[in-house]
Design a protein with these regions (language model features):
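Hydrophobic ligand-binding cavity/cleft-lining segments
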Residues: 1-36
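Conserved short-loop catalytic and cofactor-binding motifs
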Residues: 5, 33, 44, 96, ...
Length: 125
């Protein structure tokens, strides 16, 4: 298992970025794919038309999102934490993704950089 941490700058305020990460209609705007998302803890989510699935664990509006990402029946859980920091250019998103299966690590990192945050950065450019 591996962990990944990185900061991503976005040119939008934290409250706006939070909405873009937690509301299905907003997610669909920057991904171009079907999304199922709730801002309630203990709910399932699906992104990129089911390519990413998991469970929402914790929300602190405008500040923090914690999710369990599913990789089959993997144990321990793969946890994604997004902390939104105000930044002079908008928001700096602190991503921490723990317990990534070794065989999925490179694909996950590429997905974060190109698909997930790459799409968000392009959306806000």
């Amino acid at each position: 298992m591996k962990d990944y941490k990185k900061y991503y700058p976005l040119s939008a305020p934290p409250d706006e970025v939070y909405e873009a990460l937690t509301k299905a209609d907003k997610i669909e705007m920057w991904t171009g794919e079907t999304a199922e998302m709730s801002q309630n803890s203990d709910t399932e989510f699906s992104l990129w038309d089911g390519s990413i699935v998991g469970k929402n664990l914790e929300f602190d509006p405008g500040k923090k999102i914690v999710q369990h990402w599913y990789f089959g029946d993997q144990s321990p859980a793969s946890i994604v934490t997004l902390i939104l920091h105000p930044h002079k250019q908008g928001t700096s998103v602190e991503l921490t993704h723990t317990n990534i299966p070794d065989e999925d690590y490179e694909d996950i990192v590429q997905g974060w950089n190109e698909s997930y945050f790459g799409s968000l950065q392009e959306f806000y450019s």
